[in-house]
């Protein structure tokens, strides 16, 4: 299995010849996870059979099972894990009865899936992307040096192919796996919300709001982190690809670059799609909550109310009432203005100015900054630009103005500090407490 890719018949034959199989009921899986956690606490990573028996006894207590013949049952469970290549047993004639056990790579992988991979956060993702950026930067520098010095294939494999294959690709796979685990987490949250909505409505609504908001916030935070680094990583990969164009002997690097670009595109694309899907689900739940009482065809709520009133003295309760204010989307770009005739003249402050005109003004200003940047080689401080621009517009337009400026700034260039993985400081941009977090653009 040294080749980078295998055909389906080869993989089927390989697994069949080695008789691979997995059978992990809940009790066995919990036993394996307990072993993994205990193993992480040990410095040597080695366990005695007595340790495994104690762990098995603890897991059986959690399942409230009988402890009769615990040693025999623990021995059977250990033998099953050894047979399925989840544990390795080491023994000799000098250590009879004192076998040493270590988790196999398969055992570590299975336990990691349930333990470590769920520790997915924006901080961890930032660290991973920072490592990837450093590796790709070194690989691209080595590629350019290889072109200048006309290095041989051994140089390219060691300095370019190896870090991309065994560091960058593995981190991409780790991020992809974490996204798939988050998909499962979203599904479990949906099941939890569905269960809440069938129970106590007073507690369910607040719990549903909390679950929806937490998940939406996590998805957006992670996607913002991916978007911030995605374009820069793609640019570095293109640098390496430019170095191997026309080199038939370096086809393996060109193929690897293509695979990495596809993985990165897939990760970023699915992250955005997951957000869109969750937004749709969020709206669906809110719509259901708003209309459920009106659609009470089976009189479920009215029946609950009758029962609550009937048993009030046995189970007293408080009546909570709320009236949500109607929400009006003031920034609907598709909203059609009324064209009714009006008499008189409007004051200058109330004259209508379309969003497209406003957009053109900001674009013209940003283009002027870009020309000055090219001519004088001056960096662009986005916080200062926002602060200066917002002073020229009323507070009601600050959101639209800031959004346009940020959109234009992203197209101008990049900041070298973005590759360091260090978050910039928050900078105030108006007198109402609005702040922005952005590095100085110093590379066009």
UniProtKB/Swiss-Prot annotation:
Give the record's keywords alphabetically. Calcium, Cell cycle, Cell division, Chromosome partition, Cytoplasm, DNA condensation
Which residues does the annotated region (Leucine-zipper) include? 212-240
Stored InterPro entries: Chromosome_partition_MukF, MukF_C, MukF_C_sf, MukF_M, MukF_M_sp, MukF_WHTH, WH-like_DNA-bd_sf, WH_DNA-bd_sf
Q: Does the keyword Chloroplast apply?
A: no
A GO CC annotation recorded here is: nucleoid
GO biological process, any:
cell division
> Can you say where in the cell this protein is located?
Cytoplasm, Nucleoid
The molecular function terms of the Gene Ontology recorded here are: calcium ion binding
Its main subcellular localisation, reduced to a broad class, is cytoplasm
Superkingdom classification of source? Bacteria
Described by its record, this protein's role is as follows: Involved in chromosome condensation, segregation and cell cycle progression. May participate in facilitating chromosome segregation by condensation DNA from both sides of a centrally located replisome during cell division. Not required for mini-F plasmid partitioning. Probably acts via its interaction with MukB and MukE. Overexpression results in anucleate cells. It has a calcium binding activity.
Q: How does it assemble?
A: Interacts, and probably forms a ternary complex, with MukE and MukB via its C-terminal region. The complex formation is stimulated by calcium or magnesium. It is required for an interaction between MukE and MukB.
Protein family = Belongs to the MukF family.
Name this polypeptide is given: Chromosome partition protein MukF
Organism (species): Haemophilus influenzae (strain ATCC 51907 / DSM 11121 / KW20 / Rd)
